[in-house]
UniProtKB/Swiss-Prot annotation:
CDD domains: ABC_PstB_phosphate_transporter
Sequence positions that bind ATP: G68, P69, S70, G71, C72, G73, K74, S75
Pfam families given in the database record: ABC_tran (PF00005)
InterPro entries: AAA+_ATPase, ABC_transporter-like_ATP-bd, ABC_transporter-like_CS, P-loop_NTPase, PstB-like
Function: Part of the ABC transporter complex PstSACB involved in phosphate import. Responsible for energy coupling to the transport system.
Protein name: Phosphate import ATP-binding protein PstB
Subunit structure: The complex is composed of two ATP-binding proteins (PstB), two transmembrane proteins (PstC and PstA) and a solute-binding protein (PstS).
Keywords of this entry: ATP-binding, Cell inner membrane, Cell membrane, Membrane, Nucleotide-binding, Phosphate transport, Translocase, Transport
Enzyme Commission number(s) from the entry: 7.3.2.1
Source species taxonomy: Bacteria, Pseudomonadati, Pseudomonadota, Betaproteobacteria, Burkholderiales
Xref: PROSITE patterns: ABC_TRANSPORTER_1, ABC_TRANSPORTER_2, PSTB
Catalytic activity: phosphate(out) + ATP + H2O = ADP + 2 phosphate(in) + H(+)
Length: 282
């Protein structure tokens, strides 16, 4: 079944551990405009089976949140999308992660190009030990040859998209370390989008931030989905409810339920999901 043949309402594709109503081991049903399709994905840390037969379609131009208790596999799943595990030979993924018809798990895929297409922002702000300007320009220089004027425009564009330009435009030559925690995280988001990825992965982007900075990041996430497909891992269920269009609940390496965020939080199909959402578990 290809996307052209799918006429299913994404709001109805929300039950079963395998996601979208598919039984474990079966090919998942894809909503219209799926940006990433995960098919029978298993992940191992040595002999530990961390992800078990994950089937999931990430809708394009939407914010998808992964929730679940610590150790459930949500960050592991996120990091398979851009092969962050590739440096560790004891870690391996089996199955398929398909974007634009290409299996991202193929070993011959260029990792640098993959990570240009799928950007990532980590839990703690990680500015480079260089100026604010160079933090943005660094990644761009790896993939594009721009004139100084073009680079200036790109830096301003990225910082503006990250809602940071007005705060730093007069101190671009200063170190990124001089920014507040919230500003540093927005700098990292600007750095991620400067190379114009198709997908942006956010792994607990607000966990180290104060409430005001968290609010700014959440507003930014809502704006970014007009240009990117965004996937966020969060322990904060209120944040998932506020920011995301779709939510996946995971437990012990399995995808328990996936669907529209409003339905997941108001009327989940699975009792396990309801127990977690209401605080009776996890």
């Amino acid at each position: 079944m290809n996307m052209a043949e799918s006429h299913l309402d994404p709001s109805k594709l929300a039950t079963g551990p395998a996601g979208f109503g598919a039984a474990a081991g079966q090919r998942p049903l894809a909503p219209l405009n799926a940006k990433i399709e995960v098919k029978n994905l298993n992940f191992f840390y040595n002999q530990f089976h961390a992800l078990k037969n994950i089937n999931l379609s990430i809708p394009e131009g939407k914010v998808t949140a992964f929730i679940g208790p610590s150790g459930c596999g949500k960050s592991t799943l996120l990091r398979t999308f851009n092969k962050m595990y590739a440096l560790y030979p004891e870690q391996r993924a089996e199955g398929e992660i398909v974007m634009d018809g290409e299996n991202l798990l193929q070993s011959k895929l260029d990792i640098s190009l993959l990570r240009a297409r799928i950007g990532m922002v980590f839990q703690k702000p990680t500015p480079f030990p260089m100026s604010i300007y160079d933090n943005i320009a660094f990644g761009v220089k790896m993939f594009e040859r721009l004139t100084r004027s073009e680079m200036d425009d790109r830096v301003e564009w990225a910082l503006t998209k990250a809602a940071l330009w007005n705060e730093v435009k007069d101190k671009l030559s200063q170190s990124g370390y001089g920014l507040s925690g919230g500003q540093q995280q927005r700098l990292c988001i600007a750095r991620g989008i400067a190379i114009r990825p198709e997908v942006l992965l956010l792994d607990e982007p607000c966990s180290a931030l104060d409430p005001i900075s968290t609010g700014r990041i959440e507003e930014l996430i809502a704006e970014l989905k007009s240009d990117y497909t965004v996937v966020i891992v969060t322990h904060n269920m209120q944040q998932a409810a506020r920011c995301s269009d779709y939510t996946a609940y995971m437990y012990l390496g399995e995808l328990i339920e996936f669907g529209e965020t409003e339905k997941i939080f108001i009327k989940p199909a699975r009792k396990e999901t309801e127990d977690y959402i209401t605080g009776r578990f996890g």
